[in-house]
């Protein structure tokens, strides 16, 4: 699907209907070499950086996406560095604000490119 950047994805994009969402921090696909095969396959991707972009905008956009679509599940994947945990926090906040009960899972990637148990 296109676009993938949270800033650019319309909240009512057709590919969001009945989606399993993968919300990824920008650095993850570069740090984790098996990103496409192990994380992205079968999911709709939203990508962004909570440190460099407007986190409040992200929260509002993701809340709208949750409210206005039938999202089946959400996986939030981020790096182990402190700035990346902002993505998980804003996804949790958006989920709470949406009033929806959508299963949320977290994937934490080390700076060496491996999974870290959540």
Model-derived regions: residue spans:
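Iron-sulfur-associated redox domains of electron-transfer enzymes in respiratory
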Residues: 1-118
């Amino acid at each position: 699907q296109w676009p993938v950047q949270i800033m650019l994805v319309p909240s009512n994009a057709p590919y969001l209907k009945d989606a399993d969402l993968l919300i990824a921090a920008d650095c993850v696909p570069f740090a984790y070499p098996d990103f496409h095969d192990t994380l992205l396959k079968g999911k709709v991707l939203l990508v962004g950086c909570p440190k460099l972009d407007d986190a409040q905008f992200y929260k509002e956009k993701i809340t709208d996406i949750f409210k206005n679509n039938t999202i089946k599940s959400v996986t939030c994947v981020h790096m182990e560095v402190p700035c990346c945990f902002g993505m998980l926090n804003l996804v949790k906040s958006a989920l709470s604000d949406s009033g929806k009960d959508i299963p949320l899972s977290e994937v934490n990637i080390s700076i060496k490119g491996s999974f870290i148990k959540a």
